[in-house]
Amino acid sequence: MAAVQQKHDWADDDELEETSTELPPPQKITNKDGSTTIIEYRLNDNGQKVKTTRRIRYITHREVVNPRVAERKSWTKFGLSVKDGAGPAPDTTSVGENIIFKPSFNWRQEAKDESKDPNAQAMKDKLKDKKVKCRICNGEHFTARCPYKDTMAPIGEAGAAADVAASAADEAAAASQGAAGAGKKGSYVPPALRGAGGAAAAGERMGGKYGERDDLATLRVTNVSEMAEEQELRDMFERFGRVTRVFLAKDRDTGLAKGFAFISFADRSDAVKACAKMDGFGFRHLILRVEFAKKAA
């Protein structure tokens, strides 16, 4: 009996076409040189198969570290960082630069050469019983190393007195010119120069009739923090009496304090109490230096 021949069904062709689009599984091959070859397949935007071959070599880097350091890295974190992973978190820890210290091999010889220098020994003997005093803030350090050398002028500096003298000379010259012009008919005379014989009238001083009293009750505060504000100084010194004026010198470019301020009281007795209490007071990690301001000549 002859075998029955099966008819070809067109639906079988569709199934074969669908199975042909399946991607082969990825392959991982270990080579003799220790590297690993990974073969992967994927479909691109046009539906075509793309074969990707990658060759990877694994290198193990071993580093000898201090066992105490390794032990600290394995400590369990606590507090707000209890859920953080291992290692330093960028939002709570800042990793600084690793500075390698390299000592000199001939440092003993350099120390001996320095000790044998006669000039250095003579200078040490000369300055043995002398105390170093800064000309800017009266601190016990050299003026060149003063932290306020770029922001404060030296106390009693000759340049400041010269500026005051120059300004007084300019005012005297202006007054003489105004008096000479007052004698001319029809010439304009400023209100400040109007008076008997063209003499300059005394202008109003800050504080009105208490101007002299204000000068005698003004304190000079040094070693002030760069982050200080005038309102903070006013709040501190108003505990001892009424404060009429607070002047905090600030840098024009950065807006930070220059390190000194002037506090004026209405009563000198209040200024005396404030000077006694606030001199040596700790403010923003610094020790304030409070003294009476020297009256300008």
UniProtKB/Swiss-Prot annotation:
It is found in: Cytoplasm. SMART domains: RRM. Its main location: cytoplasm. Keywords: Cytoplasm, Initiation factor, Protein biosynthesis, RNA-binding. Residues 217-295 form the RRM domain. One of its GO terms (biological process) is formation of cytoplasmic translation initiation complex. Residues 1-35 are annotated as: Disordered. Residues 11-20 have a biased composition (Acidic residues). One of its GO terms (molecular function) is translation initiation factor activity. Pfam families: eIF3g (PF12353), RRM_1 (PF00076). Signal peptide: none annotated. GO terms for cellular component: eukaryotic 43S preinitiation complex; eukaryotic 48S preinitiation complex; eukaryotic translation initiation factor 3 complex, eIF3e; eukaryotic translation initiation factor 3 complex, eIF3m. Residues 1-10 have a biased composition (Basic and acidic residues). The keyword Protein biosynthesis applies. Belongs to the eIF-3 subunit G family. RNA-binding component of the eukaryotic translation initiation factor 3 (eIF-3) complex, which is involved in protein synthesis of a specialized repertoire of mRNAs and, together with other initiation factors, stimulates binding of mRNA and methionyl-tRNAi to the 40S ribosome. The eIF-3 complex specifically targets and initiates translation of a subset of mRNAs involved in cell proliferation. This subunit can bind 18S rRNA. Component of the eukaryotic translation initiation factor 3 (eIF-3) complex. This is Eukaryotic translation initiation factor 3 subunit G. It comes from Neurospora crassa (strain ATCC 24698 / 74-OR23-1A / CBS 708.71 / DSM 1257 / FGSC 987).
